[in-house]
Amino acid sequence: MTVQTKTKGLAWQEKPLSDNERLKTESNFLRGTILDDLKDPLTGGFKGDNFQLIRFHGMYEQDDRDIRAERAEAKLEPLKFMLLRCRLPGGIIKPSQWIELDKFARENSHYRSIRLTNRQTFQFHGVPKAKLQTMHRLLHKLGLDSIATAADMNRNVLCTSNPIESELHRQAYEYAKKISEHLLPRTRGYLDVWVDGKKVQSSDDFLQEDEPILGKTYLPRKFKTAVVIPPLNDVDCYGNDLDFVAISDGNGQLAGFNVLAGGGLSMEHGNTKTYPNISLELGFVPPEHALKAAEAVVTTQRDFGNRSDRKNARTRYTIQNMGLDNFRAEVERRMGMPFEPIRPFKFTGRGDRIGWVKGIDGNWHLTLFIESGRLVDEGGKQLLTGVLEIAKIHKGDFRITANQNLIVANVPEGGKARIEQLARSYGLIHDGVSKLRENAMSCVSFPTCPLAMAEAERVLPDFIGELDKIMAKHGTSDDYIVTRITGCPNGCGRAMLAEIGLVGKAVGRYNLHIGGDREGVRIPRLYKENITLPEILAELDDLIGKWAAERNIGEGFGDFAIRTGIVKPVLNAPVDFWDASKAVAIARA
């Protein structure tokens, strides 16, 4: 059995462990009594520990909050169902797989939609408990699964969707897959519950299981990993626990990776012990040591991360508690080798290349803008059907991007016309979409997310429409501002790496953050607190007017807000995120 390293000198070790640690210890390697709950017809949900345990299997219990009060008045439990998030490292999926997933979404999910996420995968919303094993068995048949896409594990591994640098992308994508596989849990609990559908009867069977990397109690908190290919930072690498920045050898081949750690975007309103932070540089490793580096960072976080207070359990807090130099030294000790110095790299933007792009291998790639990633047939558009019809004729693959868009990848010259015709006829290509809208993002929020405090996905289209009018008023329609709305401070919409970030505070009210940058390397500062969308638009009307009149050539809105002193930059988030007066420049490496 795995023996986790005993650590000393960490304040949290003197405090009681969180109940989640008990839950994991007693879960029989994540099986719990989920199978018993699946047989219970009296509720649409899961009871006790199982409510949490299903998250390790890639699901969350949710309900339709739009009708929650109505059902309560009728003495009914909430309309419970599950969200499922697939594991799809790098976001690549085959058209043949998509056709089967589309069929399941239409026939078995409450909302009859597929949601593309900013972690390069898809989600089903509204899957009833009775259909869960059917769903997982379908994924298994297609060579897919949902293990470790939620809870205290390494989540879906991102990889830059770069259709131009085809060979470098192929190499980086292969490492994204290898990292994902290497950091997966080893328990058979997922297969026992969802595919085989049987209990393991003997405790001796559990004694044969081991988690050599994650340990019996897995990680202290969620853990996010990305592989990024400069100069495009589409995966928002500074917002992850662990990042591998692919470095080219100058001839289009992979020379190795710069390794960064400690990014994360969640916080809690009013809790100054929580804060978003950008990831910090550890060093460079050649490709053959990438898995060793990944394992060393993960096991360091496993053993040193806070298991008492989950609000301070992410890797960024571990680095803050240990100090960056000590964290790096521990990782190097576990790697059995030192990092090499960081290799130079630079990001120039984050947005997807909407439309056709030709790769260096001669194949074409069509990036479709999907607002908030929602594929559904409604409102005069048949987006879900459109992708299905493309999947029926496409011989290449699909790539889900970290900007919630979809790439129809590897299209030969002769196949372009038919695919574009289908995309246009089903509303997947629509001329006149502003750059502002193309660079906007939202989380799901209402009606399904139980943590939502304010709307996000459902208000984004109209909010961007009003912001487009303001941009036109000030003569900036040909430009863009990275704008993101998230329904609560947990960070799913990545608003804490936006130039304009709205964070839900209460129904109809948001905190307005400004001052991030286009490249995604700076956290925006709180500008106005607990205000309505009309009030936010009024504030932005004034600020965008100033930006239009006084900006330097090529200067983004966020950079302008910092240069002119509208807000102070967040330079050292643990110190100055909540108190701008403490903003003092520090060395990041």
Curated annotation (Swiss-Prot):
The keyword Metal-binding applies. Its EC number is 1.8.1.2. InterPro entries: CysI, NiRdtase/SiRdtase_haem-b_fer, Nit/Sulf_reduc_fer-like_dom_sf, NO2/SO3_Rdtase_4Fe4S_dom, NO2/SO3_Rdtase_4Fe4S_prot, NO2/SO3_Rdtase_4Fe4S_sf, NO2/SO3_Rdtase_FeS/sirohaem_BS. GO terms for cellular component: sulfite reductase complex (NADPH). GO terms for biological process: cysteine biosynthetic process; hydrogen sulfide biosynthetic process; sulfate assimilation. One of its GO terms (molecular function) is sulfite reductase (NADPH) activity. Siroheme binds at residue 492. It catalyses: hydrogen sulfide + 3 NADP(+) + 3 H2O = sulfite + 3 NADPH + 4 H(+). [4Fe-4S] cluster binds at residues 443, 449, 488, 492. It comes from the Bacteria. Gene3D superfamilies: Sulfite Reductase Hemoprotein, domain 1. Pathway: Sulfur metabolism; hydrogen sulfide biosynthesis; hydrogen sulfide from sulfite (NADPH route): step 1/1. Keywords: 4Fe-4S, Amino-acid biosynthesis, Cysteine biosynthesis, Heme, Iron, Iron-sulfur, Metal-binding, NADP, Oxidoreductase. Component of the sulfite reductase complex that catalyzes the 6-electron reduction of sulfite to sulfide. This is one of several activities required for the biosynthesis of L-cysteine from sulfate. Alpha(8)-beta(8). The alpha component is a flavoprotein, the beta component is a hemoprotein. This is Sulfite reductase [NADPH] hemoprotein beta-component. It comes from Neisseria meningitidis serogroup A / serotype 4A (strain DSM 15465 / Z2491). The gene is cysI.
